[in-house]
Curated annotation (Swiss-Prot):
This is Aspartyl/glutamyl-tRNA(Asn/Gln) amidotransferase subunit C. It comes from Rhodopseudomonas palustris (strain ATCC BAA-98 / CGA009). GO terms for biological process: glutaminyl-tRNAGln biosynthesis via transamidation; regulation of translational fidelity; translation. GO terms for molecular function: asparaginyl-tRNA synthase (glutamine-hydrolyzing) activity; ATP binding; glutaminyl-tRNA synthase (glutamine-hydrolyzing) activity. Allows the formation of correctly charged Asn-tRNA(Asn) or Gln-tRNA(Gln) through the transamidation of misacylated Asp-tRNA(Asn) or Glu-tRNA(Gln) in organisms which lack either or both of asparaginyl-tRNA or glutaminyl-tRNA synthetases. The reaction takes place in the presence of glutamine and ATP through an activated phospho-Asp-tRNA(Asn) or phospho-Glu-tRNA(Gln).
């Protein structure tokens, strides 16, 4: 797969990045190099390799699913500048 100049401009537009015409050829080369590397990865033989989330074996840390006392509303809003009935009061932003 190859990226042309029009595709570079479109990607820049979608990403809301200002790209000058002088930068397009350089970015085109960079994107093509990245795609070539990804294509090389598809040639790697992964037969017999189990799917993994990390290169180092580790167990997911899980906590017990227990109900905690949630009656700490006073502590939650203690540092808020303005509250009412355990709710944060904020300035109105939509008219």
């Amino acid at each position: 797969m190859s990226v042309d100049a029009a595709t570079v401009r479109r990607i820049a537009h979608l990403a809301r990045i200002a790209v000058t015409e002088d930068e397009v050829p350089h970015l085109q080369g960079e994107l093509n190099a990245m795609l070539a590397f990804v294509e090389q990865l598809s040639e790697v033989n992964v037969e017999g390799v189990e799917p993994m989330t990390s290169v180092t074996p580790m167990q997911m840390k899980k906590r017990a699913d227990v109900v905690n006392d949630g009656e700490i509303a006073d502590q939650v809003v203690a540092n808020a500048p303005s509250t009412e009935d355990h709710f944060f009061l904020v300035p109105k932003v939509v008219e």
